[in-house]
Protein backbone atom coordinates (compact mmCIF):
# COMPACT_ATOMS: atom_id res chain seq x y z
CA UNK A 1 0.00 0.00 0.00
CA UNK A 2 2.88 2.37 0.78
CA UNK A 3 4.34 1.94 -2.71
CA UNK A 4 0.90 2.51 -4.29
CA UNK A 5 0.38 5.73 -2.33
CA UNK A 6 3.90 6.97 -3.10
CA UNK A 7 3.28 6.39 -6.80
CA UNK A 8 -0.35 7.51 -7.15
CA UNK A 9 -1.27 9.48 -3.99
CA UNK A 10 -0.51 12.93 -5.41
CA UNK A 11 -2.43 12.15 -8.61
CA UNK A 12 -5.42 10.84 -6.65
CA UNK A 13 -5.52 14.05 -4.63
CA UNK A 14 -4.81 16.36 -7.59
CA UNK A 15 -7.74 15.05 -9.63
CA UNK A 16 -10.16 14.65 -6.73
CA UNK A 17 -10.36 10.87 -6.95
CA UNK A 18 -11.54 8.71 -4.09
CA UNK A 19 -10.45 5.37 -2.75
CA UNK A 20 -12.66 2.54 -1.56
CA UNK A 21 -11.70 -0.68 0.17
CA UNK A 22 -13.09 -3.70 2.00
CA UNK A 23 -9.89 -3.73 4.06
CA UNK A 24 -9.88 -1.22 6.91
CA UNK A 25 -6.07 -1.29 7.02
CA UNK A 26 -6.17 0.39 3.58
CA UNK A 27 -8.46 3.09 4.97
CA UNK A 28 -5.99 3.75 7.81
CA UNK A 29 -3.01 3.82 5.43
CA UNK A 30 -4.66 6.32 3.09
CA UNK A 31 -5.73 8.59 5.95
CA UNK A 32 -2.23 8.45 7.44
CA UNK A 33 -0.76 9.31 4.04
CA UNK A 34 -3.13 12.24 3.44
CA UNK A 35 -6.32 12.80 5.40
CA UNK A 36 -7.74 14.96 2.58
CA UNK A 37 -8.07 12.00 0.20
CA UNK A 38 -11.67 10.74 0.46
CA UNK A 39 -11.66 7.09 1.48
CA UNK A 40 -14.74 4.87 1.76
CA UNK A 41 -15.07 1.65 3.70
CA UNK A 42 -17.00 -0.94 1.67
CA UNK A 43 -19.56 -2.84 3.74
CA UNK A 44 -20.95 -5.98 2.08
CA UNK A 45 -23.72 -6.25 4.67
CA UNK A 46 -25.31 -4.24 7.45
CA UNK A 47 -25.02 -5.74 10.90
CA UNK A 48 -23.45 -3.28 13.36
CA UNK A 49 -22.95 0.40 12.63
CA UNK A 50 -19.20 0.93 12.22
CA UNK A 51 -17.31 3.66 14.05
CA UNK A 52 -14.43 4.54 11.77
CA UNK A 53 -12.44 7.50 10.50
CA UNK A 54 -13.46 6.76 6.90
CA UNK A 55 -14.93 9.58 4.81
CA UNK A 56 -17.96 7.37 4.39
CA UNK A 57 -19.32 3.95 3.60
CA UNK A 58 -20.22 2.04 0.50
CA UNK A 59 -23.13 -0.22 1.46
CA UNK A 60 -24.71 -3.06 -0.51
CA UNK A 61 -28.21 -1.77 -1.25
CA UNK A 62 -30.26 -4.81 -0.21
CA UNK A 63 -28.98 -4.62 3.39
CA UNK A 64 -29.19 -0.84 3.70
CA UNK A 65 -31.93 0.32 6.06
CA UNK A 66 -33.18 3.38 7.91
CA UNK A 67 -31.34 2.36 11.10
CA UNK A 68 -27.98 2.63 9.31
CA UNK A 69 -28.93 5.93 7.67
CA UNK A 70 -30.19 7.42 10.95
CA UNK A 71 -26.89 6.51 12.63
CA UNK A 72 -24.95 7.91 9.68
CA UNK A 73 -26.75 11.25 10.01
CA UNK A 74 -25.15 11.69 13.44
CA UNK A 75 -21.72 11.72 11.76
CA UNK A 76 -20.10 13.77 9.01
CA UNK A 77 -19.72 10.66 6.87
CA UNK A 78 -21.23 10.03 3.47
CA UNK A 79 -23.01 7.05 1.92
CA UNK A 80 -22.68 5.34 -1.45
CA UNK A 81 -24.96 2.46 -2.39
CA UNK A 82 -24.00 -0.49 -4.60
CA UNK A 83 -24.99 -2.08 -6.89
CA UNK A 84 -27.88 0.04 -8.13
CA UNK A 85 -28.93 -1.82 -11.29
CA UNK A 86 -32.70 -1.44 -11.20
CA UNK A 87 -35.42 1.09 -10.46
CA UNK A 88 -36.21 -0.51 -7.08
CA UNK A 89 -32.59 -0.11 -5.94
CA UNK A 90 -32.52 3.44 -7.35
CA UNK A 91 -35.71 4.41 -5.50
CA UNK A 92 -34.39 2.93 -2.25
CA UNK A 93 -31.07 4.78 -2.58
CA UNK A 94 -32.87 8.08 -3.23
CA UNK A 95 -35.42 7.50 -0.48
CA UNK A 96 -32.66 6.80 2.05
CA UNK A 97 -30.67 9.84 0.98
CA UNK A 98 -27.58 8.18 -0.50
CA UNK A 99 -24.83 10.58 -1.56
CA UNK A 100 -23.94 8.43 -4.55
CA UNK A 101 -24.67 5.22 -6.41
CA UNK A 102 -22.44 2.57 -7.90
CA UNK A 103 -23.98 0.80 -10.88
CA UNK A 104 -23.30 -1.49 -13.81
CA UNK A 105 -26.15 0.23 -15.69
CA UNK A 106 -25.29 3.91 -15.99
CA UNK A 107 -27.96 4.53 -18.65
CA UNK A 108 -30.69 3.23 -16.33
CA UNK A 109 -29.52 5.45 -13.45
CA UNK A 110 -29.28 8.48 -15.75
CA UNK A 111 -32.78 7.73 -17.04
CA UNK A 112 -34.14 7.45 -13.48
CA UNK A 113 -32.46 10.74 -12.50
CA UNK A 114 -33.91 12.49 -15.56
CA UNK A 115 -37.36 11.08 -14.83
CA UNK A 116 -37.14 12.21 -11.19
CA UNK A 117 -36.05 15.71 -12.22
CA UNK A 118 -38.62 16.07 -15.00
CA UNK A 119 -41.63 14.52 -13.27
CA UNK A 120 -42.84 16.43 -10.22
CA UNK A 121 -45.25 13.58 -9.41
CA UNK A 122 -42.36 11.11 -9.26
CA UNK A 123 -40.38 13.44 -7.01
CA UNK A 124 -43.47 13.99 -4.86
CA UNK A 125 -44.01 10.23 -4.62
CA UNK A 126 -40.42 9.65 -3.48
CA UNK A 127 -40.71 12.45 -0.93
CA UNK A 128 -43.99 11.01 0.36
CA UNK A 129 -42.39 7.56 0.67
CA UNK A 130 -39.44 9.08 2.51
CA UNK A 131 -41.75 10.92 4.90
CA UNK A 132 -43.68 7.70 5.61
CA UNK A 133 -40.47 5.73 5.87
CA UNK A 134 -38.98 8.02 8.49
CA UNK A 135 -42.37 8.65 10.13
CA UNK A 136 -42.16 12.46 10.11
Predicted segments, located by residue:
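Metal-dependent phosphodiesterase/phospholipase catalytic core, i.e.
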Residues: 1-38, 59, 75, 130-136
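C-terminal active-site rim and adjoining tail of enzyme catalytic domains
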Residues: 33, 37-136
